[in-house]
Amino acid sequence: MAETTTKDDKPLFGRPWIFIRGVPSMKFLPPEGPAEIAFAGRSNVGKSSLINALVGHKGLARTSNTPGRTQELNYFVPDGYSGEADDLPPMALVDMPGYGYAQAPKEQVDAWTKLVFDYLRGRSTLKRVYVLIDARHGIKKNDEEVLALLDKAAVSYQIVLTKTDKIKAAGVPRLIAETLDKIKKRPAAYPEVLSTSSEKGAGIEDLRITIEQAVAR
């Protein structure tokens, strides 16, 4: 008799993914249960593009050249799951609002900031946060503030360098070494820095592997 394959048996990144909801405040969060992997970073660092590259669906997470476009916690899950309590997925990816965007109204920025900080501090199913850093700029003050928050909340995080195709290839190892040096004393930082290019596909498979490992823990 042939074995029956269920939707739970498929590889996490070997299937289509869908958007299930945008969360403007904590009360709209989906039921806790599946492992959650979140992506944080400055506005226009490339979070949406990276998520699209991860799942192999260019139009899944909306991308924009306008900083501050993502204003909610956007949830993505493997296709075939609703994300409701009776149909929980094996994992969810969470695209968080970008920080450090000075052009938005202060009230709006404050609301985004509170949402992100409340989520990071209070979500028990959050397995890891990937903090995206633009390879052209390195770690900035806003990034350091977020890393400090994650350290304080004891939320595991890993640095991902984005847009590495925009700098000289010889500069990538040096940037990785400099970044590792900056985070070596941070208690919640995962001691490995990933380098990626959503446009070229570089480092995407390595990122998938680390996500699967984080979810399995």
Curated annotation (Swiss-Prot):
Which positions does UniProt annotate for GTP binding? 41-48, 68-72, 95-98, 162-165, 196-198
Annotated keywords: Cell cycle, Cell division, GTP-binding, Magnesium, Metal-binding, Nucleotide-binding, Septation
Cofactor(s) recorded in Swiss-Prot or TrEMBL: Mg(2+)
Q: Which GO terms describe its molecular function?
A: GTP binding; metal ion binding
List of residues binding Mg(2+): S48, T70
Q: Which family does it belong to?
A: Belongs to the TRAFAC class TrmE-Era-EngA-EngB-Septin-like GTPase superfamily. EngB GTPase family.
- PANTHER family, per this entry? ENGB-TYPE G DOMAIN-CONTAINING PROTEIN, MSS1/TRME-RELATED GTP-BINDING PROTEIN
Supply the name of the protein.
Answer: Probable GTP-binding protein EngB
The beginning of the lineage is:
Bacteria, Pseudomonadati, Pseudomonadota, Alphaproteobacteria, Hyphomicrobiales
